[in-house]
């Protein structure tokens, strides 16, 4: 059983049909395979192929997806992936003309980050206190996942009374 990585994704594309295609694929739970399918020749080697080409072993477990009503060339989605964010897939989406902005947080292995069109701003949170995390990561990343708030709560619940 994997640790789950929380992901927040914003996609934009000049062709609104590509945004609709992404929306529909996310809604079906087939986003990765829609844009970067596992080749038939790799079906027996799916695990290696998926981790190499998507950055994770399974499709996204989507919890929300919507197209911006005011700007139909923009889509926002939230989903979980096994172990890590699908950064390799994001790189592929860029080659298809998408602008990709993503945030991710994996609480089990204590890392988080923000990815924007090829730049990964990665933060190793292992061994840091909630206060250190709050002062280390960008506010928008912390707010997206409630990282420091959850850590403060955990610290409070696990601090022995003196």
Per-range role (PLM):
Residues 1-162:
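Long, contiguous binding/interaction regions
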């Amino acid at each position: 059983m994997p640790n789950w990585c929380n992901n927040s994704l914003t996609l934009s594309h000049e062709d609104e049909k590509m945004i609709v295609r992404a929306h529909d694929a996310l809604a079906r739970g087939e986003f990765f395979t829609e844009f970067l399918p596992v080749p038939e020749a790799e079906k027996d080697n799916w695990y290696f192929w998926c981790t190499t080409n998507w950055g994770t072993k399974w499709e996204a477990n989507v919890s929300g997806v919507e197209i911006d009503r005011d700007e139909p060339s923009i889509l926002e989605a939230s989903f979980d992936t096994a172990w890590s964010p699908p950064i390799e897939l994001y790189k592929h989406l860029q080659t298809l003309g998408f602008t990709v902005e993503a945030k991710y947080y994996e609480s089990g292995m204590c890392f988080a980050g923000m990815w924007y069109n090829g730049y990964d701003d990665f933060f190793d949170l292992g061994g840091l206190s909630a206060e250190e995390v709050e002062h280390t990561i960008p506010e928008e990343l912390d707010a997206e996942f409630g990282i420091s708030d959850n850590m403060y709560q955990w610290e409070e619940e696990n601090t022995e009374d003196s």
